[in-house]
Amino acid sequence: MKSLLLLTTLLIPLHLGMAWSAKYAVDCPEHCDNTECRSSLRCKRTVLDDCGCCQVCAAGPGETCYRTVSGMDGVKCGPGLKCHFYSEEDDFGDEFGVCKDCPYGTFGMDCKETCNCQSGICDRVTGRCLDFPFFQYAAAKSPSRTSASQTERDAASGDGNAVREEIGDRNAARPSVMKWLNPR
């Protein structure tokens, strides 16, 4: 009798743990039916809803996100983004935040995947390793001493007075009023 009680005590939390860890959502159907899903063609990016049945619109960088709201568009962050939650709740008592890029070295939904690239830099959405060809191009095109012609070397020699005078003339033509640039 004791062994049956012990076995039951051990198996019930295991079964409940698997059910709770699978997903947290309210009013999910027992079986998914794609005909019940709304169209997500107008969305820039999509994610699975909390039930794991339908594609819904995803929130983008800088947009508001919520902990969990079943079947609603634009409340979960898209791939390569993570919801950074605020300490307060909204008027309905729901936790909310803002979508931000995954930190370097992570990627995927909620930034749960780890980048295994040699450089440690990967695409935040797909996890594909990124290489920067401009560094390789610059190293391959390093100047050599024999590439400059005699006229280029002659033009580069001198005391530099002509260059200073030319820069001084350009600065004199500028107005002294500070110009404000629009932010990007």
Swiss-Prot record:
Glycans are attached at S157. GO terms for molecular function: hepatocyte growth factor receptor binding; integrin binding. GO terms for cellular component: extracellular region. Its main location: secreted. It is found in: Secreted. The keyword Glycoprotein applies. Coiled coil: none annotated. Residues 151-172 have a biased composition (Basic and acidic residues). O-glycosylated; contains chondroitin sulfate and dermatan sulfate. InterPro entries: ESM1, Growth_fac_rcpt_cys_sf, IGFBP-like. Disulfide bonds join C28-C51, C32-C53, C37-C54, C43-C57, C65-C83, C77-C99. Gene3D superfamilies: 4.10.40.20. GO terms for biological process: angiogenesis; positive regulation of cell population proliferation; positive regulation of hepatocyte growth factor receptor signaling pathway; sprouting angiogenesis. Pineal gland specific. Residues 24-102 form the IGFBP N-terminal domain. Residues 145-184 are annotated as: Disordered. Residues 1-21 form the signal peptide. It holds the Pfam family IGFBP. Keywords: Angiogenesis, Disulfide bond, Glycoprotein, Proteoglycan, Secreted, Signal. Involved in angiogenesis; promotes angiogenic sprouting. May have potent implications in lung endothelial cell-leukocyte interactions. PANTHER family: ENDOTHELIAL CELL-SPECIFIC MOLECULE 1, ENDOTHELIAL CELL-SPECIFIC MOLECULE 1 ESM-1. This is Endothelial cell-specific molecule 1. It comes from Rattus norvegicus.
